[in-house]
Amino acid sequence: MRFMIMVKATKGTEAGIFPENAEKLFEAMQVYHDELVKAGVLLDASGLKPSSAGWKVKYTGDKRTVVDGPFSEAKEMIAGYTLIQTKTREEALEWTRRFPKPHFDHECEIEVRQLYELDDFATVEAAKDAIGKFREMETQLKQ
């Protein structure tokens, strides 16, 4: 089971400002992620640049429109993520409880969402051909 731990953005992260206690935060994150590695559950982790360095693609009918950042509502955006793979939801929840507070000096939150696995789509008739092709891609990526 794969889970994404998402660190919610703040006005500071959206401004590209590192907190005054950034050294303490980086140290706590390094220790936590090292524990994930030792447990064999870490798949990936990274911080995201502010939305001003990104863009969105808006779909209207068959038309695609690129909209450059920055975007409003920082609290709805993600400032970073950690992707883990665990045997159970409970194990993922335990790792989440140990996640360092992303912003020591003010209120913040993380959100955790489980990723779909290909087997989750096995009963969807329209997905059956695509599932086989996605499995081939997974095999190629692992080589």
Task: Label every model-predicted segment.
Residues 1-143:
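Conserved, structured core segments of small domains
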